Each structure stands twice: as C-alpha cells, then as structure tokens.
C-alpha cells in the first residue's frame, strides 16, 4: 500500500527521476525504464513493470505513486475538437483542448488555475488566480490526452514511433501564464521533449507568454522552445490598458527580449498573437504601428477574433476589418494568419478557457459552462 507521504512520479523529469532512483540505491538506467513505463506505456502501478527488479517494485509500492488529475468532463465537437475539464482539487478546474488536423494534432495545455495577468479581453484573468499547477498536473494533461486519444483510435500504449503519436504538437496556451509557473512548466516541457517520454521536438512545443521578460531570458538559456508572445497592441498606452503586465515590461523591453530569444530559438521567428477588438486595436493605422514596433524582430502574426464574454465591454472586430488589418501586414511581407473557430458546440475558448465568467475557477460552477473554442495552431 502506498504511504500518505508518497511522491508522485509524474512530478519528475528525467534528472529528477534519476535522483529519486538514486535515493533508493538504484542505478540511473532504472530511471529510464521507469520513465518509459509511465509516459510511453501509461502504466498506473508498479506490478506490471516487468523489466524492473521485484525488489525495486516493492520499494516503489511503499514510497511512490503515479497520480493523475481527475477528469471532470470530456466533450467531443462535431469537428473532432475534444475538450477535457480537469479537476485539480479544492473546487478548481482547468481545461485541456485537442485540435485535430490532417497532418497534426495539437494539444492546448493549461499551466495555472486562473491567471494573475488579468488581460482585459481574457475571461480567465477576470476570474482571478487560484494557484500554480504542479509538474504532474501539467504533464498529466498530455499523458491523459495522448492515451485517451490512442484508445479512441484502437492504438495500444507503447513507443510505437512518431507515426503512431496522436498529439504531435503542444501549445502552452491554456489557462495561466506559463512563465509565472516556471519551476513546474519547465520540467513538464522537458518530459514532452524527452525520447524516453513523448519525444516531441522543440519546434513542436510552443510556449505563449504575455511578456514576462526575465523569464523569457531564462527560458532561452535553459530550454528554448518555440515562442509566441501575446502582444495585442502596437503601443505602450494601449497595451498598458489591455495587458497590464506591460506597465512592468513595456514594448521596448519586450522586443529586445524577443531579439535575444531568437538567438537560441528552434525557429527563426516569434509568433505575435493579436486579439482583434472592434474600435480598440483594429484599424489600418494600428496595423502600420504594429509593423513599426516589431520591425526589428523576425515574426509572424496570428490574429485572433475576440470571443465575447459578459462584462468585458469589448466587441469582436468585424470580419471585413480583420481582413483589412491583415492585408496591411501581408502587404508589408509579414506572414499573417487569422485563427479559425473550432468546436463551438463544446464550449471552450482561447481567452475563455474558464467558460462563463464565475468567481475564480470553481469546478461545480464550471462543469459544462459556456464559451467558444478557436483553433490553436503550433507555430
């Protein structure tokens, strides 16, 4: 029987698992075996780990566990988009969304219950911040989704190669600001990249940040994955209003951080995300200003039609205005995409992953709550 003080092995990346096995008097190769069982074979207990010595299995049964977050709900859209509501305890919940496409499958992962950044156009921020997720709760979203999706396709667990992988891309674009939970997010991403776990390339793991400049630099030094920046405004005055974090890290500092990051990034551009708000940030003049502020950063733009929520006081830009805005950027030679709406019928949105605005992220209030999901593309 597992003790009350057992460690959750999902909290360990490769280095952590080697250290843990060392504390049990085991050699490093045992950690690799254990990691493969957990992350490639979806093992939930130790008895079935047949290539581990029985003595080690007995040690683990007394000291360790493999504990996944509980799934509160699981919905599939008519277009194949799938959304899970994950119970993370104390009445809090986060959402994980899978977006299937012909050549890839993208998983949108949450890093916090709620968010402290409080962007004006994001309903998650309006609910306040509850807590950081643990590494186990973050990597558990990928583990849960990958093996649930494999089961739905009749595929068995196991390291069957990239052709058998269902989740081919991960975007840290769910609830929360990933760089404000750095100590848990980075080990989770290391597992995403580890060949003894999920084996994704750095180009296929994208972290989206609102612009936490010091942590962007740290990420670049320690684990440079693809980077997206939630920009949403072309000048400091407007961005101060839409993204309050800009008051601490204004655009000049943010653009400089992007330039530094590109020196080590797995891609040669930054993706700038831009929520299209009617009459707020969507004129052709704004587009030209946006080109000016980003001129020294190789980039692409991802324009996001706003998903309205109660009390936001904001309206989605009209399609024709989004098109005009995009054309200014395209005419300047910058790759520009407009994010598509996906899975309307299962209610989960970029910027609205918390569902209908409630008090914080209360699970009982949120199961089945309303929202919209829009396509999340790895970049």
Curated annotation (Swiss-Prot):
Protein EC: 2.1.1.192
UniProt GO MF annotations: 4 iron, 4 sulfur cluster binding; metal ion binding; rRNA (adenine(2503)-C2-)-methyltransferase activity; rRNA binding; tRNA (adenine(37)-C2)-methyltransferase activity; tRNA binding
Cofactor annotation comment: Binds 1 [4Fe-4S] cluster. The cluster is coordinated with 3 cysteines and an exchangeable S-adenosyl-L-methionine.
Binding site for S-adenosyl-L-methionine: 176-177, 208, 230-232, 307
GO CC, alphabetical: cytoplasm
Disulfide bridge partners, by residue number: 108-350
Keyword Methyltransferase among record annotations: yes
Cofactors required: [4Fe-4S] cluster
The protein's name in its UniProt record: Dual-specificity RNA methyltransferase RlmN
Source taxonomy: Bacteria, Pseudomonadati, Pseudomonadota, Betaproteobacteria, Burkholderiales
């Amino acid at each position: 029987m597992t003790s009350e003080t057992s460690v959750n092995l999902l909290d360990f990346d490769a280095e952590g698992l080697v250290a843990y096995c060392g504390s049990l008097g085991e050699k490093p190769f045992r950690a690799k075996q254990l990691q493969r069982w957990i992350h490639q074979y979806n093992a939930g207990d130790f008895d079935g780990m047949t290539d581990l010595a029985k003595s080690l299995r007995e040690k683990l049964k007394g000291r360790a566990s493999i504990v996944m977050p509980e799934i509160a709900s699981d919905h599939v859209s008519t277009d194949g988009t799938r959304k899970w509501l994950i119970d993370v305890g104390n009445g809090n919940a986060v959402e994980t969304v899978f977006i299937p496409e012909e050549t890839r499958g993208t998983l949108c992962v949450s890093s916090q219950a709620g968010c402290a950044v409080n962007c004006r156009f994001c309903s998650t921020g309006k609910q306040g911040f509850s807590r950081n997720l643990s590494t186990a709760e973050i990597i558990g979203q990928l583990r849960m989704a990958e093996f649930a999706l494999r089961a739905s396709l009749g595929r068995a667990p196991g390291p069957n190669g990239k052709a058998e992988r269902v989740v081919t891309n991960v975007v840290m674009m769910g609830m929360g600001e990933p760089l404000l939970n750095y100590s848990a997010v980075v080990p989770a991403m290391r597992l995403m990249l580890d060949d003894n776990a999920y084996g994704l390339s750095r180009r296929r793991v994208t972290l989206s940040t609102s612009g936490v400049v010091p942590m962007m630099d740290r990420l670049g030094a320690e684990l440079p994955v693809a980077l997206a920046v939630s920009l949403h405004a072309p000048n400091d005055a407007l961005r101060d209003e839409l993204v309050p974090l800009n008051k601490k890290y204004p655009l000049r500092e943010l653009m400089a951080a992007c330039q530094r990051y590109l020196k080590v990034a797995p891609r040669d551009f930054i993706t700038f995300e831009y929520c299209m708000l009617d009459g707020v940030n969507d004129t052709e003049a704004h587009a030209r200003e946006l080109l000016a502020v980003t001129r020294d950063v190789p980039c692409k733009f991802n324009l996001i039609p706003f998903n309205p929520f109660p009390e936001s006081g904001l309206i989605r830009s009209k399609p024709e205005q989004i098109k005009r805005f995009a054309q200014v950027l395209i005419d300047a030679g910058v790759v520009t995409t407009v994010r598509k709406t996906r899975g309307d019928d299962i209610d989960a949105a970029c910027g609205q992953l918390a569902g209908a605005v409630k008090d914080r992220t209360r699970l009982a209030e949120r199961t089945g709550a309303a929202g919209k999901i829009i396509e999340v593309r790895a970049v």
